[in-house]
Amino acid sequence: WSAVWAIPILTLSHFVLKKKIKLGYLWFLILPAAVYLATYAPMFLTGHGLDIFWGMQKQMWWYHTGLKATHPYTSPWWSWPLLARPIYLYTSNEVGGFVSRIYATGNPLIFWAGLASIIVSFVYSLKFRIKKLALVIFSYLVFFVPWAASPRIMFLYHYLPSIPFLAIALGYILRRNLKLIVPAVTIALLLFLYFYPHWAGLSVPLSLDKSYYWFSSWR
């Protein structure tokens, strides 16, 4: 359902690029709906009807709007760009001084430099009237800010649809500051190699595992 927010992005992009909305663009509504319906083909082929399909949609809506639950790794929507509260997906017991985790967190450089790039790009889009850059900022926000209205518990992974636009903004800023490209890519790569065992569930010494928790909220 997160993809629903792509519809206003596609619509706005045509206005930004000064293109008229034509009848053919209705496919942006028809095709996604058809693909979504097609994913339920196995259910329909086993004899279930539209009543079951509609019941599932209502159940999903209730899950996102009415579920009352708690979780130790929940995080508010505004904290996601700060990478304030990642989430454990798996953890093992210590065996011989080694432990393995699957820890859903991001590359700190991408998250934090990306957030700074979003802010700077927003300023540039206003100052220099760069419509395409404004579209990137809008796309980033439209996948992210609506979660502020959600009553359900939320996690860092709900931020993922905004990440591609964060990366575009980061790339734009780096392109305007070419001297930063090599250091930024190098640091991002080193951080990837450093965090990879923590992301992928590889067995590591306890001393290395403890080094991953830069902040108390990461534990």
Question: Regions from the language model: what does each represent?
Answer:
Residues 5, 153-175:
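Hydrophobic/aromatic-rich transmembrane helices and adjacent perimembrane loops
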Residues 5-33, 129, 174:
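Perimembrane helix-loop-helix junctions
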Residues 12, 41, 45-46, 176-219:
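Transmembrane helical bundles and short interhelical boundary loops of multi-pass, membrane-embedded
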Residues 33-83, 203-213:
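Aromatic-rich transmembrane-lumenal/periplasmic boundary elements in polytopic membrane proteins
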Residues 79-105, 208-219:
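Juxtamembrane membrane-water interface segments that cap and precede transmembrane helices
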Residues 93-97, 101-130:
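Hydrophobic, aromatic-rich transmembrane alpha-helices
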Residues 116-118, 128-148:
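Transmembrane alpha-helix segments characteristic
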Residues 147-160, 198-202:
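Membrane-interface catalytic loops of GT-C/OST-like multi-pass glycosylation enzymes that act
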